[in-house]
Amino acid sequence: MQLVLSVSGIVLGVVLVGGLSTGYVAPASQPDPVAQTVVQQYVSEVADLGDDEGHHGVWLQSEDGVLAHHQGAVPLPAASLTKVATTLAALQAWGPTHEFVTLVDATGPIQDGVLRGDLVVQGGSDPFFVTEDALILRQSLHALGLKRVLGKLIISGNFFMNFTTDPALSGQLLKHVLSPPPRRAARQWHRTLAPEGQQLTIAGAVEVVSFCPPTRASLVRHRSLALFKLLKRMNVYSNNAMAEMFTAALGGPPQMVRLAALAAGVPTYELHLINGSGLGSENQLSARTICALFAAIHRLVMPARLTVADIFPVAGIDRGTIRHRHLPVYTVVKTGTLRHVATLAGVILTRTHGPVWFALLNQGGNLWGFRTQQDALLQSLVEHWGAADPPPASFIPTSPWADTTRNDILVRVKAGGG
């Protein structure tokens, strides 16, 4: 079986020199024969577990060129490997340290701990505003001395909480944390989460508005996690809601595809994507393109002193969707699963070839069998080439998972206020 891709008589490959460049040029003239044999055996085994060999894709590439390939240029259902494109588009649009800002304002004066007006929350498309953030927000409002809101809780802009994109429901979730309903169980829950004296009462209902009303004072600015940390959380747990929020903030799937293709140096027609999460077999990528997307991510984050391991789960360190996998240690990966699809892509760190980018796309019915074979293939390749020891620093996580306080207390009375 020919494992080096040829399209229209031209041999193609993804340039990953130093892991930095992308695009298509001639690969190494001598693909690794052992890798070719291992891939051939892998394809035969996964075909026995699912669909025939034409429904499986493999691409292995080092900085020197293509090492082995099967159906590498054929778009196949990518499942959550679609999130690799979403990740790249987000990094291209905003940069790895970008923060999404949620503002909390007041429409009236605050006197003796009482806001005589509405509390206004202006969402900024933060995809990871969760209950813990709401609790910290309540603490910040308490630090301002705010104890009671006589008006409503007004939701403006793109405010999401606990992964729901419904602004009304997000507002209700926020109010439930800031000002729990007067039920005994709720009061007990509230006292458990907040020290005595930090309770906040909001008298009015939640109201969602299209345009932010005039406000009198800016109270708190809540900053999201840095984008690279948001993407890490999305990819470790393959969070579909976060992926769709990112895609919406980018302007929708077509714009996401344009940004990802631009950053990776590949044509847009190689990204057959209808959403940002990968839900649906209509989302299709070739194994070759997925490797180009991964390499572009590595290139984009390096100027910020980050690595691709700060963006995706790392075997032996992270859990999430790889908690039951048997991958070579320090392998940086993204998993993908649909009802009849199991995919895996990322980079293994080898002694012989350095970083080797890979993408494996499998279709059929035996998902656990596919995963077992995927893990075994990577273990075989690392055994053949040797594991990088120590692993290169450019592929090791640099940033801790832990969070820091991200609320800025503003207390700024706007012009015309009192």
Describe these PLM feature segments.
Residues 18-75, 138-143:
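Beta-lactamase-like hydrolase cores
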Residues 35, 69, 250-418:
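Small-residue-rich helix-loop
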Residues 53-55, 73, 79-82, 97-99, ...:
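Extracytoplasmic
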Residues 57-61, 85, 118-122, 152-156, ...:
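Soluble periplasmic/extracytoplasmic beta-strand elements of cell-envelope proteins
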Residues 78-96, 153, 234, 358:
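Active-site SXXK
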Residues 92-107, 304-309:
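Short, well-structured active-site flanking segments
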Residues 103-161, 167-169:
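Active-site-adjacent, His/Asp/Glu-enriched structural segments that form or flank metal-binding
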Residues 149, 159-311:
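A small/polar active-site loop signature that marks catalytic segments
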